[in-house]
Structure formats: structure tokens, C-alpha cells
């Protein structure tokens, strides 16, 4: 059962509203997102390129770009080594195009998810050595590649690291000892000594900051680097970074540019998904376009996605984009099968575990993270999904707020051949013989309580469903872009009746309702969740007959509470308010 609670953060909402020309409702919503003080509020509402932080504040950024300038002037061969997800693809694109623009002799390599696994490895290093590569620059990986970078250095190569992942460490007697590779320069805002004001950049944003400095040193107008902002925004949302502070500005500015994008690949991907560039929002990055990019790295090679953005021929770009859309459709089908298998395993034997470890040897290893996310959502427990690979077992984990997944993996790192990640997500490789040992140890170390497993729904503001009007709903758009750490406002109302409920949609998976308030006002509502579960919930609570009456549009005794977001429904030139139900009781 979910636990609903109202966020109560105090402020002079009337004063804020007056100073910024907004409603007290919007002022409260901004405060609920942790934004305090006039300067921070102004930055939240209107922050633009001028408010971005100085890239030179990134530790080693000056040194790394000095090395690049020297290598470019000497025409040394440079290779970008990225990653196979959306952030890795966009990071690689930015570095490759940026270094090329500066006159560098540069190529790129993206690891094969199945053969290479995550990030730089000895195989890729030896390939680079055989190709006469002088300098390797990583993006969205490299911070944990201590041994691999030592190998590259032993072969005489220069190694530059740009990354955003957690810094690896060992722990002795409660004290952390952070590891650092032999790389010639490392740019990662998470380094302890780095004074960069914002630590939550994605890999593509770090790469872009490097290119900004490189352009300046190569006498290229820094404004040219703004062309990459659509890629940075795409990666920031696609890699599920917090949409706070600088990330909020990066995504906002990137969305402006994508609405008029001239990149044939980006336009083709948008059009193949039956959208227009001016329609694109952060939602489309995360749930429509992004999965197409990730599908190439999961089922084929991420080079397909990268080549899409490098493509200058419109017809060819359209063909590649169509291939990516098809791959994503295949991925969806395979994911559904994997989720079903995983839930069976959980229900048959793992329900008592605080941390779920699901071993699915025959499931495609690239789908482990998605499946883990779905199981985490269903069970509200930290979840690892492991699959069989060529060299042992690989897996991905997805966590809940109370559980820092990367820190917990550090407690049993001796079991892994490789691991890394964030508080909310992680990846790991281990011998098959260690799977059960891992299951036991990760649970033995777990300090979660029963309270931690209860999903918590944070309500921004209680508000009657008939209160929001069109001007207020339009004003709420000031809070965009929405995403992690800047979710759509969660508004709640209670004691609502159901005048009518109708199941619609091609797959009969959308519920349209007419709700009635205690004051007799009617409001249109829509619910995109599990319709059968909705019926069963109210059937248990009020009886199946009452539910049947509601679906027939007849008088019934059902009363419901909802968490919702108001939207404008446009139909045949008319506008009306419709609420989108997120949760119900």
C-alpha cells in the first residue's frame, strides 16, 4: 500500500508570486523542489546560457585540453572511446565532431555490449595500439578503468578520461580510499578535489564542457559549441540525470534548439516516430526517442545510432532511423517476455529477500537493466537482474531511494570481475559460481527496514480537481522541463465520485472517467495505468456491483482520492481542463 503525504515547506508564497509575476500555487511548487532565494528562483524560471558554470572549474579541464591542442597540432592519431547507451553515443558524437572541427586526426570506437562489456578494455586498447593511435580519450566511462589505463600507458599511449560516474574506492575501518588511474588528465565533476559547483552532469555534458574550452583554445567561436546542446539535453534526460540547477538549463536550451534542428539524423528519428521537431519535450527524449538509441546498443551495435547523427544524407538518415524504431519494437517484445520470467522467479522463491537477485541465464543481457527497473517498480525493492554471458554472468541493478546501490556493491566487490554505477543504478560482472554467494551477501549487508519498502507518494499541494483553470495550467509550463528531481507537480483531491468510467484506446488500456466533486462539479479525467488493477482495487473496496454501475454510467457509491496533474484538452478548436490521474485510493 502506498503512503501519501503532503510536502510542507514554508515560504512567503504571496511575496514570491508578486516578485516573479506568478501565482502562489506555482511559487509553492517551486519551493517544494528545493529552490530557495530570489536568485535561485530566477535561475530556475529563466536561467539561460549566461548562467552556465565556467567549464574551467572542472578539475584537469585546462590540462586535458592543452594536451588535445598539442596532439591536434602534431596531427597525432586520437581515438574517442565511448559507451553503448544514449549518453555514451552523444558523448562520442560531441567529442568526435568537436575534435574534428579543431582539425584533429580523430576516429571513434564504441564497445560492443556483448563482446566488450562496459567501457574501455584491454581488447579496445590493443586495437588502438595496432591502429597506431597515439591518444585515447574516453567519454561516459574510464573513471574505474585502473588496470586498463595502466595497460594503455605501458604501450606508450596518452590517455585522457572524461566521465561522470562515481569514483571507485576501497573501504578500510570505515575510511574510504579513492582510486585514481594513471591517465594523463581526468575530467569528472565527482572527483573529491574538483570544485565544480554542480556534480550531477551526464557524460555528454562533461564532454561538451571540454569542447567549449577546446574551441576557445583553437580560436573557434564558443557559440559554435552551442550546436551540441540538443545532444547534451538528449543525453541528460536519457541517462536519467537530475533536472536541477545546470542540467535544467542545459535541457531547456537543448530543447529550444531541437525544435529547429538541422541535424538530418535527429530530424529523421523524430519523424520516424511520427512526431515533429517543434513537439519534442523532455518526455519524448526519455520515453520515445531515447529508447530507440539505446535499442541499437542493446540488440545490435550503438554505432548504428552514432552513424545516424553523423549522417548528412536525408534519405539514408531516414533509413537508419527506421531501423532504430524497428529495433526498439523488438526490444519491447523481448522485455515483456523477460519481465514475465523475472516475476515468476520472484513469486516462486525470492519474495522474502530485501534485495531481489534474479538470475535469468537465457534472457538477452542487454535487457537486464530494463527488466530490473520493472521489477523494482512492481515490488519496490532494490533489484538485480543477472544473465549468462560469454565470460560468466553480467547484470544490472535498479534501486529505491533508501538504498545506495553502488555503495552496497562496494561491500562485496571481491565477488565481481567488474562493477560500477550510481546510487540508483549499477552494473556488474561476476563468475557464475558467485551468483548465490552474491545473493546471500548483498542481503546480509542490507539495512533496509519495512518502512523503506513502502512506496511514498509526495503530494505537492491538495487542490480540488475543478480549481485549475487554463491560465494556471499554462503557467505550470514554467516548471518544465520535467524529469528526475523535477517531476510534474503531484496535486491531490479526495472524496470524488465516479459519474462514468469507459475503457478506450487501441489496446483497451486507457480509462476515461467523469468525476464529480462534493460540490457537484464534474471534471474529465484519464488514467493510463493498469485498468484491470483499477477495477479489482475498487471491487475489493466497494464490491464488483458498484464498479459495474460506475462503468455503466449509473449511480454508485464509490468515492476515490486521486493524485493528478491538470492538462489542457484541445478538441475541434475548443480547450478544456482534463486531469491525468497518477495514483488513486
Predicted features along the sequence, with ranges:
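Short, well-ordered strand-loop elements centered on a beta-strand within folded domains, enriched
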Residues: 175-178, 183-186, 391-399, 522-526, ...
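Hydrophobic helix-and-loop "lid/oligomerization" segment in the mid-to-C-terminal part
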Residues: 7-135, 155-156, 173-176, 182, ...
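Catalytic domains of riboflavin
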Residues: 1-3
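Mid-to-C-terminal polyanion-binding domains and interfaces
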Residues: 70-74, 316-322, 326-359, 411-585
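Active-site cavity-forming subdomains of large catalytic enzyme subunits
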Residues: 126-204, 208-217, 227
